[in-house]
Amino acid sequence: MSRRNTAKKRFASPDPLYKSRLVSMLTVRILKSGKKTLSQRIIYQALDIVKERTESDPLNILEKAIRNITPLVEVKARRVGGSTYQVPIEVRAYRGTNLALRWITKFSRDRSGKSMSMKLANEIMDAANETGNSIRKREDTHRMAEANKAFAHYRY
């Protein structure tokens, strides 16, 4: 047991334009080499593209996309008697949101195209429409958990 005090959970402050914590969390995920203003510009351009194409509130589209991507269960490796089992565990809300944001940024970076803002906008719209690579990743995660349901009694 650690004798130190436990660290308090710090939550991201809302971004200046949309006043949304979700946008500021996405800003941190896209961040490279501490260039936060560039990261914000990429996100705002992506949300403008989403607004042009869908003619609706881009923040609602982003929230819908995150909701669609957020996994409900995931597998965690657990070593029992010399063999490693993939144990399915439920995902807490904050971790689920973090995973969704991580997957959105990863798969938008992997997309082919010119600008990051265009790739991010396409990934957000695909996720809102329940298509795209990030949705496939969520389904793969759920499939892994379903396949290893037999080891659920090894839960932490």
Swiss-Prot record:
Keyword presence, Transmembrane: no
Keywords for this protein: Chloroplast, Plastid, Ribonucleoprotein, Ribosomal protein, RNA-binding, rRNA-binding
One GO cellular component, as annotated: chloroplast
Molecular-function GO terms, alphabetical: rRNA binding; structural constituent of ribosome
InterPro entries for this protein: Ribosomal_uS7, Ribosomal_uS7_bac/org-type, Ribosomal_uS7_CS, Ribosomal_uS7_dom, Ribosomal_uS7_dom_sf
Oligomeric and partner information: Part of the 30S ribosomal subunit.
Name of protein: Small ribosomal subunit protein uS7c
Lineage of origin: Eukaryota, Rhodophyta, Bangiophyceae, Bangiales, Bangiaceae
